[in-house]
Amino acid sequence: MHLYAAVDGRPTHAGAMVIVEERITFHGDIGVETGDVDVNATLVVMGSVDEGREVRVAHDLEVHGDVDRAHLEAGGSLTVTGSCVHSQLRAGGRQAVVRHLLAALGSTSEDLAVVATTVEHMVSSARDRGQQLPPGRALLALMEGPYAGVRTHMAEVEAVIDAHGAAMFPEGAVAAAHAVSHVVAGLGMHELTGVDQLRALIVTLADQEHALRTQLADPSAVRTAYLQACDVEASGDLVITGSGIFNSTIFVGGDLWVEGGRSTLRGGHAIVGGAMHVHELGGDGGARMDVELQGRTVTPDRLRADVVHPGVHVTINEYPVVFEDLRQGVALGADEEGHLLPQAA
């Protein structure tokens, strides 16, 4: 007997049943014996990730240990309870793919709602004239005429799914996209028996689109205790719970929170889409530290630091601020017009 799962994951026995767990727990270190890891699930590593290893997961990744000279990539959020040294961390790759799909989809759901109403009118008008116009033929005429853009968008959606792999998207979204693409391409013309059938496809596609947009409302974060000489990218926040970030390159779409008691951000380059709070920014000796706060977030304390050392260069709303002397209690922000609000500089 052969069993096929509807989702990817680890099969486990539960009495007379077989359950596929989309959350996999690995007890031990990821090292030479395990090799690299690539799973389409959430992965929890109850250990460390050793030098040279690559770990890629489609959903969330948790490492209950340290990461040394490794590459970690999560479609969702990424958490490391220990320190990360000379490593690359990526979180939110799945969200980037979802954005790509939604961009290809464009306004297709709204356009299709208009198409369904137009098909209904065309069929009704033909009936009033004593003629019979199948809904599928009316739809085909619209797809080859004024609504050819709908067909183009759905072809782009299919191309995105093919390029990234169907496993990167919810199964329902892929099924809805395939069903609509099949119909608007004219391949399902004879299968379309009524306008209600078309509207049902459109509603399903719109529901899946809404679900995908909901995913983007919760950007993926990176959370760890300590970063040294790392390259970090996250669509959401970066949260540091330990001593800080040193000589690293940071790109986060959300906030940067360095929460340790006397946490430090020193050396390297940080690009932040939201707010940034840190105890100590820069270090002794005046070594250069670059911080870019991108976008036009309106807040008087978008950058807050207890101590800022000389050599720190901050760009906020395209305004450059260079710290040449030691400053304490620094808060920088912007007003509604995007103008700089230095409270202490």
Q: What are the functions of these language-model segments?
A:
Residues 1-46, 88-345:
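Charge-rich, low-hydrophobicity low-complexity segments
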Residues 38-75, 81, 269:
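Basic (Lys/Arg-enriched) interaction patch that binds polyanionic ligands
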